[in-house]
């Protein structure tokens, strides 16, 4: 899991591929699903703010799409760049990254063990590996079918495009926050995880 502190209210989506271009339908699909996830995260975080998702630029590279989250007012739709709003944007970006990391970590299977530890959640996957994430990220992942569907549909679309070899979210300086390789797209395109051996363990929060 990325240990980088998310700063700012924008991020970049990077599509890897030898052609340095992306099919328009795949791009639009990915942006729609990303927007859905962002709005659901904002709702679950209960920020009380209306968030708009703006595409700032399509940049050269493997293929970069620069995304900015801005709070808007209903009457003017103006960007309100305050410290508080930028922090809300950073929290949303961090949660989106965490959701992708968690889905990647679980590899299409249910968690073997889940344990709350204060404001964090410890998760053990089928291979016995451990990840620790924010409670909010785990709760959204567990209880939002909208987010699960959007994540799955995004990676299903990417998996069906042979030209795309990887998907990455970076900060505005193009420092990687989370990366998913082509070989992992199939696992992430599953809408629900399978339970391999019985029910998973839900442990009480440590005191």
What are these regions (language model features)?
Residues 2-206:
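Charged, alpha-helical interface segments at or near domain boundaries
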């Amino acid at each position: 899991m990325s240990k980088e502190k998310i700063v700012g209210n924008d991020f970049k989506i990077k599509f890897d591929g030898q052609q340095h271009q992306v099919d328009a339908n795949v791009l639009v699909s990915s942006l729609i699903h990303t927007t859905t996830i962002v709005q659901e995260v904002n709702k679950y975080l209960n920020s009380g703010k209306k968030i708009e998702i703006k595409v700032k630029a399509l940049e050269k590279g493997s293929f970069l799409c620069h995304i900015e989250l801005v709070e808007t007012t209903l009457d003017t739709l103006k960007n309100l760049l305050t410290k508080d709003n930028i922090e809300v944007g950073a929290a949303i970006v961090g949660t989106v990254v965490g959701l992708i990391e968690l889905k990647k970590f679980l590899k299409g299977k249910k968690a073997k063990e889940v344990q709350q530890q204060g404001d964090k959640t410890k998760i053990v996957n089928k291979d016995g590996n451990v990840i620790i994430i924010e409670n909010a990220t785990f709760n959204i992942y567990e209880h939002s079918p909208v987010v699960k569907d959007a994540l799955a549909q995004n990676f299903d679309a990417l998996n069906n495009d042979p030209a795309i070899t990887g998907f990455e979210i970076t900060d505005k300086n193009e420092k990687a926050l989370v990366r998913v390789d082509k070989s992992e797209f199939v696992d992430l395109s599953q809408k629900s995880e399978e339970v391999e051996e019985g029910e998973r363990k839900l442990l009480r929060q440590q005191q």
